[in-house]
Amino acid sequence: MRHILERIFFTSFAKKGWLKMLCAFEGLVDEKTKERLRKRNYHGNTCLHIATEEHRGRQAIWLIEKLVEYGADLDEKKHCDGDTVLHMAVKKGDYKLATWMCQQLSMRFGSRKLSQPHGVSSSIEKR
């Protein structure tokens, strides 16, 4: 029962942008919670995809940072079209989020050369 409630809560918090409520769960996060954050809703989206669809700029970044801290995966692809959060941010013109995402990816991969998704780097550079 707890796993169903957690998934509903995290999905709702991501959709509504309730960062304070999300932060209130900090002490309750365990390995099982991390697995549940990667689960998909009935549309095939994770909490990260929902936060990206519903919010822009700084608000999206704050939510995504917290979800990743709890165990969500930045590289998770949407079920329907294979887009990552970075693809979604670029497609909707949220270049603040896209730039932040690129910074996160380069920090995670260090000096390893990244192969950027087609059109992402050129779209960001135009802004």
UniProtKB/Swiss-Prot annotation:
Keywords: ANK repeat, Host-virus interaction, Inhibition of host NF-kappa-B by virus, Repeat. It holds the Pfam family Ank_2. SUPFAM superfamilies: Ankyrin repeat. The keyword Repeat applies. It comes from the Viruses. InterPro entries: Ankyrin_rpt, Ankyrin_rpt-contain_sf, NF-kappa-B_inhibitor. The keyword Chaperone does not apply. GO terms for biological process: cellular response to tumor necrosis factor; symbiont-mediated suppression of host NF-kappaB cascade. ANK repeats lie at residues 43-76, 81-111. GO terms for molecular function: NF-kappaB binding. Belongs to the polydnaviridae I-Kappa-B-like protein family. Suppresses the host immune response through NF-kappa-B inactivation. Possesses ankyrin repeat domains required for NF-kappa-B binding but lacks the regulatory regions required for dissociation from NF-kappa-B and degradation. Therefore, prevents host NF-kappa-B release and subsequent activation. This is I-Kappa-B like protein J1. The gene is J2.
